[in-house]
Amino acid sequence: WIGLTFLIFYVLMFVLHAKDYYLAPIYPVLFAAGAIAWERRFATRPLVAAERVFAFPILEAALILTGLLVLPMTSPILRPAAWVRYTTALHLKSNKTETTSSGELPQFYADRFGWQQQVAIVARTFNSLSPADQHRVCIFAGNYGEAGAIDFFNRRDHLNLPPAISGHNNYWLWGMHGCDPDLVIAVIDDSPDDISKKYESVTIVGVRDTPYAMPFEHGNIYLLRGRRPSAPVNWADERHYY
């Protein structure tokens, strides 16, 4: 059943164009089951019994050395600069491990960077507002990672920010939480010229520039005031799933 389960999920992941590491957790189970099957089949053979005293220490040493070699791929034990040298030396460097190209680091590593800087700018901007504006402001993020970072650090550090809103995935379902789209702190990658078509006042309050973050997480953070009557808010238009 283990082998059949793997085959079924492999086909499903292939058809759905899933990310390559989604099946990774099942491989240790397959290796363990395969090892038992091989041992039952070959352990009693005279040649295997005679040479196992040498074979097992060699195998164990190979497993330990290989495990140490690939350990940085499974645990964040290296600093970013050391990681880049490591992957370059082993020819493992790839700038596209998910749906978009990354910079120096693959996305699963790059996505660990930049969130504190982003939230610090948002919190500073929020605290610069009057109490009345703080009560009504929207904090809008372009994707669930940005919105999730705001909500996470808001709770952890007691920043007293309103909930982040976003049109991305489940955040769209949670709506706008009653905030006023006439005043927005926006973490988006749109240009000031494009935003000015929707808002009368567009102020850059900070720049996201953490070196090792994903390229699309570099950009401006805005304070927007005065939604133009020619561009009314339609929450349904903000919905995007990927």
Label the predicted regions.
Residues Q117, I121, S130, D157-Y242:
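Aromatic/acidic, Gly/Pro-rich catalytic loop(s) in extracytoplasmic/lumenal soluble domains
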